[in-house]
A protein has these predicted regions:
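Non-catalytic accessory segments flanking enzyme active sites
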Residues: 1-19, 23, 27-30, 41, ...
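Short coil/turn segments that connect the beta-strands within blades of beta-propeller domains
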Residues: 35-36, 79-81, 127
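Structural recognition of the beta-propeller blade-terminating site
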Residues: 1, 51-54, 101, 146
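Active-site-proximal cap/loop segments of hydrolase catalytic domains
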Residues: 208, 222-432
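Residue-level signal for short, function-critical loop segments
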Residues: 44, 89, 195, 300, ...
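Beta-propeller blade termini and top-face loops
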Residues: 25, 45-49, 93-98, 141, ...
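Serine-hydrolase catalytic-loop signature spanning alpha/beta hydrolases and amidase-signature enzymes
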Residues: 213-215, 244
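Short beta-strand element of the alpha/beta-hydrolase
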Residues: 193, 201-212
Length: 432
């Protein structure tokens, strides 16, 4: 007893590394199933999947969830004989529920269609499980359904929670779009078209970039509160007449490890900026867009990309709203990391501050001054640089607020300020 025994080890390639999302799965990186089997997450085939094997080490690890798709959250059911999980298999820009035996029978898809489902959890002493679900027009609420019956549908056991007077009739269903970046990446996005858009009209367009960057915007209300808020804001902008595109740039999840870990990202070259430009050019190519009236917005990493777009391509982007963005990589929590001078220079060159001389478009900065994720000094420094160059800037600063705003009123004030800013800077003008 008390003797350790190796029953499996990962390979030596980069895709054999500990999977990025394993700590966020709900089931953890490893779990103990029935019949003395162990279940664990791995990206050894380039996608996050679940594997199982005998705890005594007999036999090879068995892939439970095959496909060019990713498992995100999982838990045990039926006395740990069954695994409930959600993934984007067969529907890359949503999440659906699946079940599979720990022994490795073929996976069974439990949900499909226009919904988004996540966080499945078995109900003790029953054959049912609960989960959270949403779709394009309905925010998250809890559902219950039976584990074994793939023909059944989840039944909500809580009502809608819209605030009184919420204009649900003004919500739109976003369309899935896919376009190419300059170096060949397929970039997925969700396109929100105003309900009152008429044939022949040219509307202003707005791009949204998520933070993280290991995130993915979906074709409906998001499972993370920050991005549920962002989805609501994109809906609000569409209701005000803008054509809105939420673009899932490289570095995000959902499209495999090679996409998430693409070379030259962030402070190593900002290669994902190619996806920002591609998104802008995609909007410009649309018949319903005024190509001279394209704005962009985002928070955190999305704020970084917003600032980079305005700094490098004010000819493409007419205005931007930057929420708590990184503006100079080496000055953002860089101390003590023992990074070489060469890489520090590369990080600086990959930052918005190095292109402020070509920044011409107006910008609104939103930041909490107690932000411990992206230091408030990032915004203070960039504002000073832009003022020295007579760039039109506006600021909304929240005293004592953190990165993910704590107060509901802070979110409302930020989003109303952003909408008002776009109304003033992207006023519809005759297209060239």
């Amino acid at each position: 007893t008390w003797n350790a025994k190796e029953i499996w080890h990962s390979g030596k390639e980069l895709h054999d590394s500990f999977p990025y999302m394993a700590d966020d799965t709900g089931g953890g990186a490893i779990g103990w199933a029935a019949d003395n089997r162990m279940v664990f997450a791995s990206e050894q085939d380039g996608w996050q999947h679940l594997y199982s094997m005998s705890a005594d080490g007999a036999g090879a690890a068995k892939l439970l969830t095959p496909g060019n798709c990713e498992v995100e959250q999982w838990s045990f059911a039926s006395a740990a004989q069954t695994i409930l999980y959600n993934s984007n298999c067969n529907d890359v820009d949503r999440r659906h529920l699946w079940s599979v035996s720990a022994g490795g029978d073929a996976p069974q898809q439990l949900s499909s269609g226009a919904g988004i489902e996540w966080s499945p959890a078995a109900v003790a002493t029953t054959d049912s499980f609960v989960y959270l679900g949403s779709d394009a027009l309905h925010a998250a609420r809890p559902f219950v359904r039976r584990v074994a019956d793939s023909r059944s549908t989840g039944q909500p056991f809580a009502g809608e929670t819209w605030p009184e007077g919420f204009p649900t009739n003004r919500l739109v269903t976003p369309e899935q779009v896919v376009f190419k970046s300059a170096d060949g990446f397929d970039i997925h996005g969700q396109l929100f078209l105003p309900k009152d858009l008429r044939p022949g009209e040219k509307r202003p367009g707005i791009l949204f970039f998520h933070g993280g960057p290991m995130r993915q915007m979906l074709l409906g209300w998001h499972y993370m509160y920050y991005y549920s808020n962002s989805y609501a804001m994109n809906q609000y902008l569409a209701s005000r007449g803008y054509v809105v595109l939420a673009a899932n740039y490289r570095s995000g999840i959902g499209y495999g490890r090679a996409f998430r870990e693409a070379p030259g990202r962030a402070g190593r070259g900002a290669s994902e900026y190619q996806d920002v430009v591609a998104a802008g050019k995609y909007l410009q190519s649309r018949a319903d867009i005024n190509p001279a009236r394209i704005g962009l917005w985002g928070g955190s990493y999305g704020g970084f990309l917003t600032a980079l777009g305005l700094a490098r391509n004010s000819d493409l982007f007419a205005a931007g709203v930057d929420l708590h963005g990184v503006h100079d990589w080496p000055t953002d929590n860089w101390d003590g990391k023992n990074i070489s001078p060469e890489l520090t220079k590369l990080a600086h060159d990959s930052s918005p501050v190095t292109a402020v001389d070509s920044w011409k478009s107006p910008v609104l900065f939103v930041h909490g001054d107690d932000d411990r994720n992206v230091y408030f000094a990032q915004t203070v420094d960039l504002v000073a640089r832009l003022r020295a160059r007579n760039v039109h800037i506006e600021q909304l600063i929240f005293p004592d607020e953190i990165h993910d705003f704590l107060l509901h009123r802070s979110w409302l004030k930020a989003y109303h300020a952003a909408s008002d800013f776009f109304d003033r800077t992207l006023t519809v003008q005759p297209a060239p």
